[in-house]
Amino acid sequence: MKKIFTFIVLAGLFASCSINSPEPEIKDETEAYEALGTLLIPSSGFTKENLRTKVVLVDQEKLDIYMFEVKFAALMPVTIDMVISDVPYVKNGSLITFYGDSIVPYAGNKPYEKYIVTELEGSITADSMFISNNYGDTPSIYRGALKQ
């Protein structure tokens, strides 16, 4: 019941975002990776297919993660564009690994402090992207294939 309530709250929180809101402004793309994949919310079994995600290496230490038209629950009335900024990363050849904790995500250019991103970890290889994290107390897993 608590998990259903969490998803309803998430849906209500993000319902204020316009369906036709402009995509978030992406910082200068020194190096960027875009993937198309699936977001899974393990606690409910909800999946969002064909989710476009972009990771931009902002500088030598930080990257930003952009998720476009994302939903976290079937009851969520609209999709949102979301940004997780200033994520520390390490690049070793073609492998990029990143991690973070206590990062406030933005949706519709507004901070959502109630859904702080915790236990963020991910990787980008030559052909795939993986992201695992919690939004508040809701775990999520994203797996995608890099666009060539």
Where in this protein do the model-derived segments appear?
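C-terminal motif of bacterial Sec signal peptides marking the signal peptidase cleavage site
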Residues: A15-S16
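N-terminal glycine/threonine-rich, aromatic-flanked beta-hairpin/loop signature
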Residues: F46-I84
